[in-house]
Every structure is written in C-alpha cells, then in structure tokens.
Swiss-Prot record:
InterPro entries: F-box-like_dom_sf, F-box_dom, F-box_LRR-repeat, Leu-rich_rpt, Leu-rich_rpt_Cys-con_subtyp, LRR_dom_sf, LRR_FXL15/At3g58940/PEG3-like. CDD domains: F-box_FBXL15. GO terms for biological process: bone mineralization; dorsal/ventral pattern formation; G2/M transition of mitotic cell cycle; positive regulation of BMP signaling pathway; protein ubiquitination; SCF-dependent proteasomal ubiquitin-dependent protein catabolic process. Keywords: Acetylation, Cytoplasm, Leucine-rich repeat, Repeat, Ubl conjugation pathway. Belongs to the FBXL15 family. Gene3D superfamilies: Ribonuclease Inhibitor. LRR repeats lie at residues 141-162, 167-188, 194-215, 220-241, 246-267. Pathway: Protein modification; protein ubiquitination. One of its GO terms (cellular component) is SCF ubiquitin ligase complex. Its main location: cytoplasm. This is F-box/LRR-repeat protein 15.
C-alpha cells in the first residue's frame, strides 16, 4: 500500500526522507509498528491522516491482541476502533474490559476472526451464552479459553462449547459456580481426549463424580486445579492417580476431604501438589511454636 499524500506543513530539505516515505508493508509495518505498544499506537494515529491510515493498516493485520497493553482500563470506543478491521486474530485477551464488555461488543469481533486459537474473557460478567455460542460456532480451532469468574457460564453454555470445539486443550472455569458435576461429566466425555489443562477451582458444586469422569476420559491431562472444591475427596484423587499418567500438577488446597494416602501415589510420580505432606506441616508447626529452627531438619 502506498502512503497517502499528506501536506508536510513546511518545506522539506532536498534528499530528506520522512518516516512515512518508507515502504509501509515492507519496512514500517513489520519492523517498526510491530514493536510499538498499543497504547502508543492510539497516540500515533492522532498525529495526521497518514499516520492514522498506517496504524489502521497495522491493526488490520494483528495476530494477537491483549487489551492489557492499552492499560488497566480501556474505553468501549477505543476497543471498537482498535479491532474494527482485524480479521486474522489468533489470540484475544479482554480482561481489562470486564466491567462493560457485552455480547454486542464481542460477537462481531468473534465473527470476523474465525482463526482464533486463544481467548481470555476472565471476569467479563456482562456476557451471556450468546457470546459463548458465537465463539464455539465460529472458532473451530479454539485451543485455549479462560472464563474464570464468569458467573453466567452454566451447564447449557458448557455443553455447547464441548459440542463445537474439537481442538480445545486448555479451559479455565475458575469460580464458574453454576457448573455442577453433570456439566463437567459431559465436557469430559465429549472433549476429554484432548484436554491438557483444566481449572474448576472455587466451585463447591464439583465433587468426586466429575473428577472421576475427567480421570477416565482425559489421558493427556497435565494440570488440574480443584482449589476450594469442597465436595472433592480422596476417591476422586485416587482415580486421577490411576488413569492420568501425564498429570504434572494438581491443586487441592482447601479440599478438606482429600487425605494424604490418596496423594502419596501422585507424589511418588513427581506430580507437583500444592498441599505439603503431613510430616512437613507438623515440622513447620513445631518450628513456629517452639522456635526450634536451628534444630529441625525440614527435609526429613
């Protein structure tokens, strides 16, 4: 694309080359604008019509967009302008928009970007099943999805996701408290074969039935977060140890019904567990209470 003509506002020295005189697609876009933070691009586009056209051309070719690069808060109008022409996004993160992001804001972006592989919508509580339906229907290559703290995610929404996202590998459902065992069981049966990372943290509705079904259907599962899942017990953990050979990390803090014997088999395999063994806990307590730090070997 040739740079549009723009009045210089003054005489140009003979032989001098302005920034905008450089080839846009061969030099400016890949080697200069690709290194400029989004926040600075918003300022740059105000300089002139030519700079605005250059920035818009760059934005149209974005493969990754993280709203956090703009700032902790981003106005609706700014997001709409930044993503107006983007049609090749592969990664999209919109957590800073959580206070106002609606279906009307998000669905057109999803529709224009069917190549999306990673989407982060953590805390976006104004969305609904419609947005998740558009994502599942329009982005068949989706691999990673964060819906943490999205209270609107229910069993029906998760079923639609499980039915239409064959490439799904990583799913964050932290604090999606409407989800119950039945929804997780369905997810495991439909998409378990490809799941590698799953968070069900802070959901008191999730119990052993869901964990056992995940274990039996997710042979490639590497990371599972069950923090605060109060109904999960030792039976679920034992099933994980039996059926999940690829498991690398397990989070069970505040799962008060999970006993050490069910965790010991995973510890022997080197699985990273966020709860210390009872002996270690006792020694730390002894150290704290009696001041025996110089005398207690915590590596017993």
């Amino acid at each position: 694309m040739e740079p549009p003509m723009e009045p210089s506002g003054g005489e140009q020295e003979p032989g001098a080359v302005r920034l905008l005189d450089l080839p846009w697609e061969d030099v400016l876009l890949p080697h200069i604008l690709s290194r400029v933070p989004l926040r600075q691009l918003l300022r740059l586009q105000r300089v002139s019509r030519a700079f605005r056209a250059l920035v818009q051309l760059h934005l149209a070719g974005l493969r990754r967009f993280d709203a956090a690069q703009v700032g902790p808060q981003i106005p609706r109008a700014a997001l709409a302008w930044l993503l107006r022409d983007a049609e090749g996004l592969q990664e999209l993160a919109l957590a800073p928009c959580h206070e106002w992001l609606s279906d009307e804001d998000l669905v057109p972006v999803l529709t224009r970007n069917p190549q999306l592989r990673s989407v982060a919508l953590a805390g976006c509580g104004q969305l609904s099943r419609r947005a998740l339906g558009a994502l599942a229907e329009g982005c068949p290559r989706l691999q990673r999805l964060s819906l943490a703290h999205c209270d609107w995610v229910d069993g029906l929404a998760l079923r639609g996701l499980a039915d239409r996202c064959p490439a799904l590998e990583e799913l964050d459902l932290t604090a999606c408290r409407q989800l119950k065992d039945e929804a997780i069981v369905y997810l495991a049966q439909r998409r378990g074969a490809g799941l590698r990372s799953l968070s069900l943290a802070v959901n008191a509705n999730v119990g052993d039935a869901a964990v056992q079904e995940l274990a039996r259907n997710c042979p490639e599962l590497e990371h599972l977060d069950l923090t605060g899942c109060l109904r999960v017990g030792s039976d679920g953990v034992r099933t994980l140890a039996e059926y999940c050979p690829a498991l690398r990390s397990l989070r069970v803090r505040h799962c008060h019904h999970v006993a050490e014997p069910s965790l010991s088999r995973l510890r022997k395999r080197g699985v990273d567990i966020d709860v210390e063994p009872p002996l270690h806990q006792a020694l730390v307590l002894l150290q704290d209470m009696a001041g025996f730090a110089p005398f207690v070997n915590l590596q017993v």
